[in-house]
Amino acid sequence: MRKMFLAGNWKMHYTSVEAAGVAKQIVDGVQNINDDVVIMITPAFTSLCKVCEVTKGSNVLLGAQNMSYENSGARTSEISPSMLLEFGVDYVILGHSECRTYLGDTDEVINKKILAGLKHPFKYLILCIGETLSERENNKTLDVVLNQIRRGLMSVSESDLKRIILAYEPVWAIGTGKTATKEEAQEVHRAIRLEIESLYSTSAADDIIIQYGGSVNVDNVGGLMGENDIDGALIGGASLKADSFLNIVNKVAK
């Protein structure tokens, strides 16, 4: 049985001191959570140093929001895998729609980042995929999402796939207050799992974690997580306050 992976993505919020404070509340709040739920928080790069002091030795995994596919060199403003590992980073989010939109990350670049990350001892790499509103309205959702998966996972072996988490985030639902219905989300998640079966194997498809992201909150998370092919959530705004994030965690962990 697959575990539930609940990841908070704090985006460009909080100073390092503020982030450490929220992290401490979350760490304290999930000490007795059952083993079937994995808790993850993803602060800004500038907060990793202080937050890692809070998460170290706890049952909360620490993540980064992006990284370079190069390990060093003339890459002004970028962060390398080795730099992230120095701060105890357990996982990295790659291919988030905001990075695709504002930073110009293409499927090819994201694939390079995935392959680079697999050469380092991260526990997980989260590959984000999702369609825009116009793509959904033109019935291109599955074409877009499955192509992003094929390109993002190019040259990834089945053994390495065990360290990959997929996160379906419809772009039109991120930060808008809109969310896919549980039926809409399940339809896409099922198609993703079948695509993994086609690319790899039935066992790989059965094992891979597929999160949902897009205005997840305490009111809709129960229905979403009740679907067969949804294995957790990548949570934005509702993860910024410890209380709201812990409410989601506790609802899923029941």
From Swiss-Prot:
SUPFAM superfamilies: Triosephosphate isomerase (TIM)
E.C. number(s) listed in UniProt: 5.3.1.1
Record's subcellular location: Cytoplasm
Record-level GO BP terms: gluconeogenesis; glyceraldehyde-3-phosphate biosynthetic process; glycerol catabolic process; glycolytic process
Enzyme class, UniProt record, top EC level: isomerase
A GO molecular function held by the record: triose-phosphate isomerase activity
Pfam families per record: TIM
Transferase recorded as keyword: no
Keywords: Cytoplasm, Gluconeogenesis, Glycolysis, Isomerase
Substrates-to-products reaction catalysed: D-glyceraldehyde 3-phosphate = dihydroxyacetone phosphate
Major subcellular location class: cytoplasm
GO cellular component assignments: cytosol
This protein's record includes keyword Isomerase: yes
List of catalytic residues: 96, 169
Protein residues bound to substrate: 9-11, 175, 215, 236-237
Pathway terms, separated by semicolons: Carbohydrate biosynthesis; gluconeogenesis; Carbohydrate degradation; glycolysis; D-glyceraldehyde 3-phosphate from glycerone phosphate: step 1/1
Protein purpose: Involved in the gluconeogenesis. Catalyzes stereospecifically the conversion of dihydroxyacetone phosphate (DHAP) to D-glyceraldehyde-3-phosphate (G3P).
Family matches, as PANTHER family: TRIOSEPHOSPHATE ISOMERASE (PTHR21139:SF42)
Subunit structure: Homodimer.
Similarity section: Belongs to the triosephosphate isomerase family.
The protein's name: Triosephosphate isomerase
Organism of origin: Borrelia hermsii (strain HS1 / DAH)
Gene name, Swiss-Prot/TrEMBL: tpiA
